[in-house]
Amino acid sequence: MGLMHSTMVPLGTPAVSFELSGSDSKVYSLESFADKTLLVIIFMCNHCPYVKAVLQRLIDLQKETEYRGVQLVGINSNDAQRYPDDSLENMQIITREKGINFPYLFDYSQQTARAYNAVCTPDIYVYGLERKLIYRGRIDDDWEHQEQVTQRDLKEALDYIIAGKEIPFEQIPSMGCSIKWKEN
């Protein structure tokens, strides 16, 4: 499984443009979300136990925050040839079965993950209206047991940002499986 921690890209780093196909058969770009106040990009996949454990939390977070102008976007950058569970076809199945309520995009070339310096699943990046990085870190303090969560880092960060306040707590790296890079 190979546990990895996110690289903690510097705050203020601009979002990188992309154009990726979604599990809903639409093509999305960074500009597709221009009307959203906050953009939460989550590098994720279908097979990683860390992602499986938090997926419902992400679905719930989208429901909780969409009326406030928050848009979650999942991006799967794994090599689907070596990891067929992470194919676009299986993304479509997972989207239907789990009721994923945010765009789930396939980064076939892996260029988007490399441009964002993403290394693990899940790897979370929050961008403000000007699309500068304002939060990167974990979703909460217990990836494995939702009922034992005592700090919802991502949700709390979104609340502070929406209120126009600085995030007062340390941003702790996300952790999960490594992105499954293509062999050159």
Question: What is each of the regions a protein language model found here?
Answer:
Residues M1-Q171, S178-N184:
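Chalcogenol-based redox active-site neighborhoods
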